[in-house]
Curated annotation (Swiss-Prot):
Annotated catalysed reactions: 5-methyl-5,6,7,8-tetrahydromethanopterin + coenzyme M + 2 Na(+)(in) = 5,6,7,8-tetrahydromethanopterin + methyl-coenzyme M + 2 Na(+)(out)
Cofactor: 5-hydroxybenzimidazolylcob(I)amide
Natural source organism: Methanocaldococcus jannaschii (strain ATCC 43067 / DSM 2661 / JAL-1 / JCM 10045 / NBRC 100440) (Methanococcus jannaschii)
Transmembrane parts of this sequence: 221-241
Protein name according to UniProt: Tetrahydromethanopterin S-methyltransferase subunit A
Length: 241
């Protein structure tokens, strides 16, 4: 029998659209953009299963719930990938690479893959705790998902030998992604628009700096010509007298 540990009191500690099963199970399932798969995952033996749409606050909430339960050692990514957010790929990048000093998920391709409320320590705990990420992205086949859960259960290494890691996210268990002061989920179309707006903003900033340089260069050129004419007239005046 694999060793088990008590999860954080009141686990799951962060609210969400998940279904909860046996907290001693070693498997967590993220159904990404798909709904209706959760109960089947729980029936197959998962500790927690639910969708995740956003590559920032959504991922933060999943990480918070996983690392507050030391028993969860496998993450299964299944269901339809979220267009624009590309949440499944962002999860994989987070597990494989971690985050940078700016909170950005290294190697993530989503529109806004930045974690503002989860620090490096928490991310490294997540990476240590999860021994395998099973990639079933874009798979909604209950049979295949159930088989993956069973395979993970058969390889249960036991709980990580660390206490539950508790993250205090804004809104806590009583709040959601719509709470004031918290990043709000956006549609894939809006994510793409925001990404393009950032690119446009950067281009405008560059063009502004270029315009300032050109204006300075032009003004300097005019001043140089005026100074040259003044000196020429001065010299001619001296020579004439």
């Amino acid at each position: 029998m694999a060793n088990k540990r008590e999860p954080a009191p009141g686990w799951p500690i962060v609210s969400g659209e998940y279904v909860v099963g046996n907290p001693e199970s070693c498997v967590g399932v993220v159904t990404l953009g798909s709904h209706g798969l959760e109960q089947a995952c729980i029936d197959a033996g998962a500790a927690i299963a639910g969708p995740c749409h956003t590559e920032n606050l959504g991922i933060e909430k999943v990480v918070a719930n996983y690392i507050s339960n030391p028993n969860i050692r496998f993450m299964i990514l299944c269901g339809s990938e979220v267009q624009g957010h590309i949440t499944g790929q962002c999860f994989k990048a987070l597990w494989e690479n971690g985050i940078g000093d700016d909170g950005g998920i290294i190697g993530a391709k989503g529109a806004i893959p930045f974690l503002e409320n989860v620090n490096k320590e928490a991310v490294e705990r997540f990476r240590r705790q999860i021994v395998e990420v099973v990639d079933l992205i874009d798979c909604e086949d209950i049979g295949k998902i159930t088989q993956a859960i069973k395979e993970c259960l058969s390889k249960d290494p036991g709980a990580i030998d660390e206490d539950p890691f508790i993250i205090e996210l804004e809104g806590g268990k009583g709040g959601g992604e719509e709470e004031e002061g918290v990043i709000k989920p956006i549609t894939p179309e809006m994510a793409i628009i925001e990404s393009r707006m950032r690119l446009i903003g950067n281009e405008m900033c560059y063009n502004g700096l270029l315009a300032k340089w050109q204006a300075g260069y032009y003004n300097g050129k005019i001043q140089g010509i005026a100074t040259g004419l003044f000196l020429m007239l001065l010299i001619m005046g001296i020579l004439m007298f």
